[in-house]
A protein has these predicted regions:
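Electrostatic, structured charged patches in enzyme active sites and in nucleic-acid/phosphate-binding
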Residues: 1-18, 84, 88-296
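Nuclease-adjacent, charged terminal/linker segments that flank catalytic cores
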Residues: 1-105, 296
């Protein structure tokens, strides 16, 4: 794949630059801190310098903000055209450029949510980077890319569209055994949603898994769905909401025991792989306070 030159300023784009543009294409917005962690090994000054070059080239731009707020970056039309010229947009669903530009025009509440999703993505990347046997080959935060329709238990046979906040995989290597793939869907709770909504979404994921729909999407056979286990990670605002959600999942019909794992935002940002995750199956039992590591 040839790397195009910027048409606004005479710069040579590096592969890392295209990775930055691709990530902005998927997630719509991120901050300099996010970019520093994902692309510059935490070196914020290096990130600032390169992002300034991309801004001067007209490939990315900054949303209006108050002086006390962090800069929030987004992909410009020239950035989209650069991805198109590099052939990268061919890897995604086909949309015209005006549609893709409108996708970046979102309100402040949506921006806050998407930045919270990026906080989660960065936390996982930093935690995995510290463990040599782990890697994250894919972490997508564009809901459309991993959406699915499923016959929901409460929809009386009607198909329901589920749009995850994210999907990612952690690959765990070992000297003797084959690489183990941990697959996760991500939901970052906005706290404005009812517990019933979160339970309903969890039921949709469970139906998608048990029906073999996810296995088919992974290139497997519907009948061999157990060969493609998934976990749904729900990130909530407080221990109180975490515990109430766990109890609501157990009380659902049918009960949701273990496909959904729940953690608070505060715990996740500190140690996403650690023993912070609560399983509904343990709610209300003697192990009510038990939590588990994500990758044992």
């Amino acid at each position: 794949m040839s790397i195009p030159r910027s048409r606004q300023e005479n710069i040579s784009l590096q592969p890392r630059d295209l990775s930055i543009l691709r990530t902005l294409f998927e997630c719509r917005v991120f901050t300099t801190t996010h970019a520093a962690s994902l692309f510059f090994n935490g070196r914020k000054e290096a990130a600032k310098k390169r992002l300034q070059i991309l801004k001067r080239a007209g490939l990315i731009a900054e949303r209006p903000r108050a002086p006390s707020e962090p800069a929030v970056l987004y992909l410009t039309r020239k950035g989209l055209e650069t991805l198109r010229d590099a052939g990268i947009l061919n890897e995604y669903p086909a949309f015209d450029l005006p549609t893709l530009l409108r996708r970046a025009q979102v309100g402040n509440s949506t921006i806050r949510h998407e930045l919270e999703v990026m906080d989660v993505k960065v936390a996982f990347h930093e935690a995995v980077r510290a463990q040599s046997q782990l890697s994250i080959p894919r972490f997508s935060t564009w809901p459309l890319l991993h959406s699915f329709t499923v016959s929901h238990p409460k929809s009386k046979g009607a198909k329901v569209l589920v749009l995850p906040d994210g999907y990612f995989e952690i690959h765990e290597s070992a000297p003797v055994h084959e690489t183990k793939i941990h697959r996760f869907f991500l939901e970052v709770d906005r706290s404005t949603e009812s517990l019933e909504t979160l339970v309903s979404r969890s039921a949709g994921y469970l139906a998608h898994y048990r029906s073999g729909g996810f296995a088919i999407g992974q290139g497997g056979d519907r009948r061999a769905f157990r060969a493609f286990p998934i976990r749904v990670l729900i990130v909530v605002s407080s221990p109180h909401r975490r515990d109430n959600l766990a109890k609501a999942l157990i009380a659902a019909t049918p009960p949701i025991y273990s496909i959904t794992w729940i953690a608070t935002r505060e715990d996740l940002l500190k140690n996403p792989l650690g023993p912070i995750w609560k399983l509904p199956i343990e709610s209300g039992s003697g192990a009510d306070r038990s939590t588990h590591p994500l990758v044992a």
